[in-house]
Amino acid sequence: MISRHLQNNLMSVDPVSSQAMELSDVTLIEGVGNEVTVVAGVVVLILALVLAWLSTYVADSGSNPLLGTIVSAGDTSVLHLGHVDHLVAGQGTPEPTELPHPSEGNDEKAEEAGEGGGDPTGEPGAGGGVEPSLEHLLDIQGLPKRQAGPGNSSLEAPVRSEDSTCLPSSPSLISVRLKFFNDTEELAVARPEDTVGALKSKYFPGQESQMKLIYQGRLLQDPARTLRSLNITDNCVIHCHRSPPGSAVAGPSSSLAPSSTTEPPNLGVSVGSLMVPVFVVLLGVVWYFRINYRQFFTAPATVSLVGVTVFFSFLVFGMYGR
């Protein structure tokens, strides 16, 4: 009796247990247990975190030997450059260090000459071997001092040397810098008595009517004016402009002429001004076909035509209603 009762109880509980066993037997991946899948997922997650941390890791400059060598090389280059600048600066001002030596040598020679105890034939020979080099050194060092005045700076000396090479030796000639609008210059040599027309014909032959000379904001229109009367002195800058042949100014009388004679009429047609009339004509033609041949126009086409017309009307009123 007891065995039968237990068997009946097992039979009654069997459906639930069978469903639980079926659910427990279901795996995420067929052929692989759920435990293996969970462990593999955890390992992959840990690897992803480690890789993400390594990708954001930045090594210190002190721990990287390559970066340290680069920085050290850069420091040494800076030090070398500073040493070179110091040497150049030392070579640029040799007067305070070298000038006392010749003076001491001259004092010693004066003392030896005053004593007169040495060999008269040997001492001049020895002094003659050293004295020319010292005098040559003194001449080289004293030359810049004689050339540079007390009020001149170190930057004015190269400019004056360049001017001395460009300027002629004759005092009656002056040099004028002709500067164009494209930053090119030309050095012109003329006399103060030369006129503007002579300057144009000398340096711009055949282009006198096209060239415009501007000095201190003034247009040099009178070709009979001399350079002296215009206060054009040595090393002055005159700006030159080459105008097109059609709009060239011949002289002061041509500036008084009406603008229609100097400027050609604008015969070109502006395409932008014709856009609105052409678009109006196209809209009118489309509306004509819409009214007379309405069977060829569908409802979306009619709505689009109305929208384009309204938009164009607002655009035209916005442009010409100001």
Swiss-Prot record:
GO cellular component: membrane
Subcellular location: Membrane
Pfam families, per the entry: ubiquitin (PF00240)
One GO-annotated biological process of the protein: ERAD pathway
Superkingdom of source: Eukaryota
PANTHER family listed in its UniProt record: PROTEIN C7ORF21 (PTHR14557), TRANSMEMBRANE AND UBIQUITIN-LIKE DOMAIN-CONTAINING PROTEIN 2 (PTHR14557:SF4)
Record's signal peptide: none
Residue ranges of domain Ubiquitin-like in the record: 174-247
Positions of the UniProt region annotated as Disordered: 88-168
Protein name: Transmembrane and ubiquitin-like domain-containing protein 2
Sorted UniProt keywords: Membrane, Transmembrane, Transmembrane helix
Transmembrane region(s): 38-58, 267-287, 296-316
Membrane topology term: Multi-pass membrane protein
